[in-house]
């Protein structure tokens, strides 16, 4: 009877009173959480603006409403408060190249990934999205053999074959006087390489007339909702469960990507394991599904599709954008291009200009071009915090409690004038000078991160850069077409760097396009 009386009382509460109670409770909760974060939180003594310390609200405004511009606010915080700042209620950001290896450590210290950075794409079983240190170490161990130096050396002939195909597309655009998108062409190249490595076959993306394909469109589509999905992780989960007819209306590029993923899932592992080709049997997917030493829960088709989604994204757009930006700088610095060609032309002739990777890696100027390209392309630009789980960290006089996400930003590392004088300039010579003076400049290139969670595909990315750059640079003369510095200047940080809108330009914003002038 008492229970029924309570129910009747609740039902009879006026709507206005109920709304008032909810509103008052919300205000009390908000004010109490602000008070706690400002005056009682373990990070209360870390410098920074109070508006950032009270919660994620300032970050939400600059990342979601202003579209990936919190990086610039963090820069202002450092300018005002110093090298260590509190960028939200939970996270500390440090701008100090000498401290990078302490955060992104390769030692025995257990370091988890910041959970706030892994939920946006809803691939919870992928290695890159694995929060726990030990679990990540085990999952990475399954993949390491496929990305070892030896494994990439064995992949060289295939990369060369794909570069040869790409050169034929350069010739096709020359013959037909067509504009060539370097972003699209290089993305097709890297996608062919990574799909072959993961699935055991490539999809001939380099054959597509305009290099327009699902993987790239899907990635670019997801970057547009990345920051919103970080704050509302269920967003992508909901999108994945919508009927394709609905999803196509909301996000057509994402719907195509998810449809491809689901088709692979429906075919299942048995069909894949029945493949007899040597390419399939050497792939990551085949190896993982067939290896009985791996626990069954770690080699399900669903988990491998999560793994494949991340590897495809990480192995296509980031490397291809770096290639395109590097060529942009070479084309706007003809003296650098001349020096590169002279160095390449000094090599003994080999069939098809298919120089071994080991030879190319030892060319000083090419090495400088590649590293300067990685430096100015930045790669993944969003913060990716690490969490020391077992001990406090100390930065100068500040103690950072265990369990606190701590991050540094690649952009600040790559543009630090103390490390890279005149950081805005493309200067391959800086790497030659550093090598001569035995300055370890390479340790400040962090687009692949560092430590135990360094990008597993960095050896493949370097191989693609060296092999593609060496052959294309000496094969064709090209010139930029409707492309300026504004197309590569970073304004928005959405996983990778994006430029701002360019007045008067409505198409191909941020795309590096060229006309092929002649074969060399």
UniProtKB/Swiss-Prot annotation:
It is found in: Membrane. Pathway: Sesquiterpene biosynthesis; trichothecene biosynthesis. Induction: Expression is positively regulated by the trichothecene cluster-specific transcription activator TRI10. It is a single-pass membrane protein. Its EC number is 1.-.-.-. One of its GO terms (cellular component) is membrane. It is an enzyme of class 1 (oxidoreductase). Glycans are attached at residue 447. Disruption phenotype: Results in the loss of production of both trichothecenes and apotrichodiol and the accumulation of the unoxygenated pathway intermediate trichodiene. Keywords: Glycoprotein, Heme, Iron, Membrane, Metal-binding, Monooxygenase, Oxidoreductase, Transmembrane, Transmembrane helix. Its cofactor is heme. Heme binds at residue 455. Cytochrome P450 monooxygenase; part of the core gene cluster that mediates the biosynthesis of trichothecenes, a very large family of chemically related bicyclic sesquiterpene compounds acting as mycotoxins, including T2-toxin. The biosynthesis of trichothecenes begins with the cyclization of farnesyl diphosphate to trichodiene and is catalyzed by the trichodiene synthase TRI5. Trichodiene undergoes a series of oxygenations catalyzed by the cytochrome P450 monooxygenase TRI4. PANTHER family: CYTOCHROME P450 (PTHR24305), N-ACETYLTRYPTOPHAN 6-HYDROXYLASE IVOC-RELATED (PTHR24305:SF157). Belongs to the cytochrome P450 family. This is Cytochrome P450 monooxygenase TRI4.
């Amino acid at each position: 009877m008492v229970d029924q009386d309570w129910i009747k009382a609740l039902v009879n509460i006026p709507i206005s009173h109920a709304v008032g109670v909810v509103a008052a409770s919300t205000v009390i909760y908000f004010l109490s959480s602000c008070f706690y974060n400002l005056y009682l939180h373990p990070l209360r003594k870390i410098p920074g603006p109070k508006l950032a310390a009270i919660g994620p609200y300032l970050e939400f405004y600059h990342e979601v409403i202003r579209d990936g511009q919190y990086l610039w606010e963090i820069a202002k915080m450092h300018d005002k408060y110093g090298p260590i700042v509190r960028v939200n209620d939970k996270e500390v950001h440090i701008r100090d190249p000498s401290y990078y290896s302490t955060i992104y450590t390769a030692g025995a210290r257990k370091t988890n990934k910041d959970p706030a950075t892994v939920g946006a794409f809803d691939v919870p079983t992928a290695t890159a999205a694995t929060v726990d240190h030990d679990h990540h170490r085990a999952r990475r161990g399954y993949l390491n053999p496929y990305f070892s130096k030896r494994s990439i050396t064995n992949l060289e002939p295939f990369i060369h074959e794909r570069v040869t195909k790409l050169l034929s597309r350069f010739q096709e655009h020359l013959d037909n006087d067509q504009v060539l998108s370097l972003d699209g062409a290089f993305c097709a190249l890297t996608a062919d390489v990574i799909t072959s490595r993961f699935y055991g076959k490539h999809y001939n993306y380099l054959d597509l007339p305009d290099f327009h394909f699902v993987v790239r469109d899907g990635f670019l589509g997801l970057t547009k909702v990345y920051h919103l999905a970080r704050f509302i992780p269920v967003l992508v989960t909901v999108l994945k469960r919508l009927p394709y007819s609905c999803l196509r209306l909301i996000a057509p590029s994402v719907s195509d990507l998810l449809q491809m993923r689901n088709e692979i899932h429906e075919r299942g592992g048995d069909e894949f394991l029945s493949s007899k080709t040597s390419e399939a049997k050497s792939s990551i997917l085949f190896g993982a599904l067939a290896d009985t030493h791996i626990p069954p829960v770690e080699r399900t088709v669903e988990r491998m599709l999560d793994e494949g989604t991340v590897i495809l994204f990480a192995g296509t757009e980031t490397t291809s954008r770096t290639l395109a930006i590097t060529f942009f700088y070479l084309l706007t610095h003809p003296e650098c291009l001349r020096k590169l060609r002279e160095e390449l032309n000094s090599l003994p002739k080999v069939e098809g200009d298919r120089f071994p990777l080991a030879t190319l890696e030892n060319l000083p100027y090419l090495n400088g071009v590649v590293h300067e390209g990685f430096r100015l392309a930045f790669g993944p630009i969003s913060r990716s915090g690490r969490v020391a789980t077992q001990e406090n960290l100390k930065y100068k006089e500040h103690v950072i409690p265990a369990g606190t996400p701590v991050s540094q930003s690649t952009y600040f590392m790559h543009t630090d004038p103390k490390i890279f004088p005149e950081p805005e300039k493309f200067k391959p010579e800086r790497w030659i000078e550093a090598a001569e003076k035995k300055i370890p400049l390479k340790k400040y290139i962090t687009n692949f991160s560092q430590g135990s969670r360094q990008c597993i595909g960095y050896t493949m990315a370097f191989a693609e850069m060296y092999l593609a750059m060496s052959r294309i640079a000496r094969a064709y003369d090209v010139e930029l077409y409707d492309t300026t510095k504004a197309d590569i200047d970073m304004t928005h940080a959405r996983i990778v760097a994006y430029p701002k809108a360019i007045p008067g330009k409505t198409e191909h914003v941020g795309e590096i396009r060229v006309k092929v002038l002649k074969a060399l």
